[in-house]
Swiss-Prot record:
EC number, as in UniProt: 1.5.1.39
Name this polypeptide is given: FMN reductase [NAD(P)H]
Note: Catalysis proceeds by a classical ping-pong bi-bi reaction mechanism. The reduction of nitro-organic compounds and inorganic chromate occur in the absence of external FMN and are therefore believed to require binding of these substrates in the active site. In contrast to these reduction processes, azo dyes are reduced only in the presence of external FMN, indicating that azo dye reduction occurs outside the active site of the enzyme.
Highest taxon of source: Bacteria
Residues reported in the UniProt entry to bind FMN: 11-15, 67, 134-136, 173-175
GO molecular function: FMN reductase (NADH) activity; FMN reductase (NADPH) activity; FMN reductase [NAD(P)H] activity
GO BP term (any one): response to toxic substance
Role played: Reduces FMNH(2) to FMN, with NADH or NADPH as reductant. It also reduces nitroaromatic compounds, quinones, chromates and azo dyes. It could supply the reduced form of FMN to luciferase-like protein and contribute to the degradation of aromatic compounds.
Enzymatic reactions: FMNH2 + NADP(+) = FMN + NADPH + 2 H(+); FMNH2 + NAD(+) = FMN + NADH + 2 H(+)
Complex and partners: Homodimer.
Family: Belongs to the flavin oxidoreductase frp family.
């Protein structure tokens, strides 16, 4: 196993950080890696907002539901779908009309590009010995976050990433069996997939039991049900439209 794959497969979310700052050279390398990642049509539909100001990080922590590691770690990156640059290129610099943000494709493209960027930043940071944890809860209060970071129209906050020096490395969390994720030639039949999920539920229950000293035995199915039994961010469409993503087509 080469060093790149070794680093990738050793990933774990870190929720406890020292107060040691992240060097600017390291941040520059992480962002350079992000910019080198692929994007749809080379449109580069991602903007990264780097936040290091303590008061601003504290506010983001509150908006994300009270996640102290955002406030504790020295760096927070916000990944945004960004069609503002495209709007400038098409309508301000040239005589074109931007239509893409009137359809769902713009949301899909922006989300995919932002996901690639976040994954790349995670891999780059961890290759430098830093710890990370992604923050999806930035979508919980998007209006306040948009105002706090002065995001213009056609820009939407999708996910965040905490970066810092780990104070404690948590145990590596088990993943679904590879057969459940990597299907050969055609999609796996439902019976086999169900069997893999059942086995994984047992593994996750054992992991949680050990991690919490017997206080919790919640499995994977129960964990995702706590989110997917409801529309936990029901205002997303409204906020997308307010930011210029009409999602009509």
């Amino acid at each position: 196993m080469n060093e790149v794959i070794k680093s990738l497969t050793d990933h774990r979310s870190i929720r406890s950080y020292t107060d040691e700052p992240v060097a600017q050279e390291q941040l520059d390398q992480i962002i350079e890696a992000v910019q080198s990642a692929p994007s749809s049509i080379n449109g580069q539909q991602v903007t990264v907002i780097t936040v290091q100001d303590k008061e601003r990080k504290k506010k983001i922590s509150e908006l994300a539901g009270g996640q102290p590691w955002i406030d504790q770690a020295p760096v927070f990156l916000l990944f945004c779908a960004d069609f503002n640059r495209a709007k400038i290129a098409l309508e301000d610099l040239h005589d074109f009309k931007m239509e893409i943000t009137n359809g769902l494709e713009s949301v899909l493209v922006g989300a995919v590009d932002a996901g690639i960027a976040l994954g790349t930043a995670t891999a780059a940071a961890e290759s430098l010995g830093l710890g990370t944890v992604p923050i999806g809860a930035v979508r919980g209060n998007p209006q306040e976050l948009i105002e706090l970071l002065e995001l213009p129209k056609y820009v939407f906050p999708l996910s965040g990433l905490v970066i810092g020096h780990p104070a404690d490395r948590s145990a590596k969390k088990p993943r679904l069996p590879q057969e459940a994720v990597n299907h050969q030639e055609t999609y796996l039949n439902q019976d086999e997939l169900t069997s893999h999920i059942q086995a994984y539920d047992e593994q996750m229950s054992e992991y949680m039991n050990k991690r919490t000293n017997g206080k919790e035995t919640r499995n994977w199915s129960q964990s995702i049900a706590s989110y997917y039994e409801r529309l936990y961010y029901p205002h997303i469409r409204e906020m997308l439209e307010k930011q210029g993503f009409k999602v009509e087509k």
